Amino acid sequence: MTVVSVPQREPLVLGGRLAPLGFSSRGYFGALPMVTTAPPPLPRIPDPRALPPTLFLPHFLGGDGPCLTPQPRAPAALPNRSLAVAGGTPRAAPKKRRKKKVRASPAGQLPSRFHQYQQHRPSLEGGRSPATGPSGAQEVPGPAAALAPSPAAAAGTEGASPDLAPLRPAAPGQTPLRKEVLKSKMGKSEKIALPHGQLVHGIHLYEQPKINRQKSKYNLPLTKITSAKRNENNFWQDSVSSDRIQKQEKKPFKNTENIKNSHLKKSAFLTEVSQKENYAGAKFSDPPSPSVLPKPPSHWMGSTVENSNQNRELMAVHLKTLLKVQT
């Protein structure tokens, strides 16, 4: 009779979660004496990828320890070779990724860039393209192959052309003998099998006139509507232009009035200038004329002796009158 207990220093895996370090299996399961006749368990090999047991101690004690995600460890081995997982189930196998189907629109629109990338991305499985069509043929990653066929149109084309058998995918080193090119023609998709030597761009050059004709047919009502709108716009433009012409005809009268006003202003300015010229006051810019200056007394000028006597008498009279000297 042997009683086995898990050591406390090693974390115990319970229900897919890591048990705290202070946890004991005896307190969780109770004192369960287990009688086994099996040989003692082999010593568990330590996992080199496992983290040290003291790493999560501050985190469990409530401190600010490093909150790292614990890596999955092998569960503790029990004597009866059973896992210590309470209600644990084996991990389910990963589900295979299902390829999303492209919704076919009535107008034959292009799929999203993600689907185009998924379709034309080279896979690692022996050079086989992951985006093989419903017939299993290898699609050409070109501009013409970007259009996804609608299921109804694809079924119709497959039923109409039984000659196009599903081609085997070519080896990675070899080039396929035929390439299937998807073409969209006004919302309808067709598959055309071409030999390897023929270029893909030749189809577009050959089919361009037909597409242009169809576009012109569909664009006829649009051109009519646009022409009617243009006629309306021309009518409004004509009316606006006539209004502008009338305004421009009215403008010359205003121009003549402006010219008259400018002439009047110029004449008033000229009269003011002429009046200033007639003013006899002193002008600091021009030298004074001799007629405006006062005449000096005659005795200052060089004169004869006779005039000098008369001037003396006059000066004596002037001085007496100025000084009020009584004679």
UniProtKB/Swiss-Prot annotation:
A motif (Nuclear localization signal) lies at residues 94-101. Residues 66-175, 280-300 are annotated as: Disordered. Residues 141-162 have a biased composition (Low complexity). A motif (SH3-binding) lies at residues 285-291. Residues 93-103 have a biased composition (Basic residues). Expressed in liver, lung, fat and NK/T cells. Nuclear receptor coactivator. May play a role in signal transduction. This is Proline-rich nuclear receptor coactivator 1. It comes from Homo sapiens (Human).
